[in-house]
């Protein structure tokens, strides 16, 4: 509840601060929102990492300068046997996720679910 309130407050501060800001130019290509985060809320990344440990890994490309100051924890890989044991029924899994994870999440599928996605591709 508290983290959601902080996130809403942070977003409203960022949006209100975007008025009047021109395009950001730097050696690292960043969006104006990223420059604003660095200038006005330099600790936002640290706070976001506390809320979501994978924040910098997930959003690094949009704000590299901000996230360089953060520790970038790696997501633990899923054990390969999990895919073999739990993901043998492609239609049921697609219904559970609401999408074809072999197409929508191809990087995950190619790393951990090769045998699972072979089943999907045959159907």
Swiss-Prot record:
Secreted is among the record's keywords: yes
PTM entry text = Contains 6 disulfide bonds.
The organs and tissues expressing this protein are described as: Expressed in acontia, a specialised envenomation structure laden with batteries of venom-containing nematocysts found only in the superfamily Metridioidea.
Query: Where in the sequence is the signal peptide annotated?
Result: 1-17
Q: Where in the cell is it found?
A: Secreted; Nematocyst
Keyword Glycosyltransferase set for record: no
Give the domain of life.
Eukaryota
For this UniProt record, the keywords arranged alphabetically read as follows: Disulfide bond, Nematocyst, Secreted, Signal, Toxin
Q: What does this protein do?
A: Cysteine-rich protein with probable toxin activity.
UniProt-recorded name of the protein = Unknown 12C protein
Q: From which source organism is this entry? A: Calliactis polypus (Hermit crab anemone)
Q: What is the lineage of its organism?
A: Eukaryota, Metazoa, Cnidaria, Anthozoa, Hexacorallia
């Amino acid at each position: 509840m508290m983290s959601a309130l902080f996130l809403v407050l942070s977003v409203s501060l960022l949006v209100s601060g975007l008025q009047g800001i021109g395009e950001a130019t730097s050696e690292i290509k960043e969006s104006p929102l990223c420059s604003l985060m660095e200038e006005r809320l330099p600790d936002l990344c640290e706070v976001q990492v506390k809320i979501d440990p994978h924040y910098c890994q997930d959003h690094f490309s949009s704000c590299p300068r901000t996230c360089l100051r953060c520790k970038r924890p790696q997501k633990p890989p899923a054990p390969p046997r999990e895919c073999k044991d739990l993901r043998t029924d492609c239609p049921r899994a697609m219904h559970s996720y609401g999408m074809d994870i072999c197409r929508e999440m191809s990087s995950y599928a190619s790393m951990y679910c090769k045998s699972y996605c072979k089943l999907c591709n045959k159907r």
